Amino acid sequence: MKQIFTDTLGVEPILINSSLVSAQNRNRLYWTNIPNVTQPEDRHIGLNDILEDISFEHPAAVRGRPLNKATIVGRRINEHGHREDYNHDIKIVQCLEVRKSNTDKSNCLTTVEKDNVLTPLPFGRHVDAFGMYCGNRLPFRFYTRLEYERLQTLPDGYTNAANETKAKKAIGNGWTVDVIAHILSHIPIHDS
């Protein structure tokens, strides 16, 4: 697909990671005929810089305390705690999978809210994230709308006109604003 775009547009893509201008890792290819586009300068924005101070059901996961990045995925887990994804006799359970990471960046936002959550739980797989079977929901939280906006470098409150679900989906589908602004800043200005 990359080669089709390159051949059709007649320009080579530039790989830019939004982590240089925001608190998320988001590697993307940009095709542009704007000359001399370079990598943006690293602003050193970390996840703690964009998180809201919020209180919620699980107070261990608030700003200022160690939070781990995680994702919630459906898995078929046998009685020994091992994955058996092809064994259709085992029910799918939503697992909180805490990533081993030494970065202070969010993973790439998507249109699926459970792809990125925050938790105080340690690295590993934690079964029954939503407490469907054991009755106790695991301690995690989703990013807020404001945090989504900040991860994509939108102004605070930019999506307030939409309901939260639609806003998060639109933001997850969008571009990182400051990356686009950086690319456009290289347009040559000619005095006429």
Name these PLM-found stretches.
Residues 176:
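A helicase ATPase "motif cassette" and its flanking acidic/Ser/Thr-rich regulatory loops
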Residues 96, 129-162:
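FAD-binding beta-loop-beta segment adjacent to the flavin cofactor pocket
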Residues 1-114, 119-132, 139-141:
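Class I S-adenosyl-L-methionine
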Residues 8, 182-190:
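C-terminal alpha-helix
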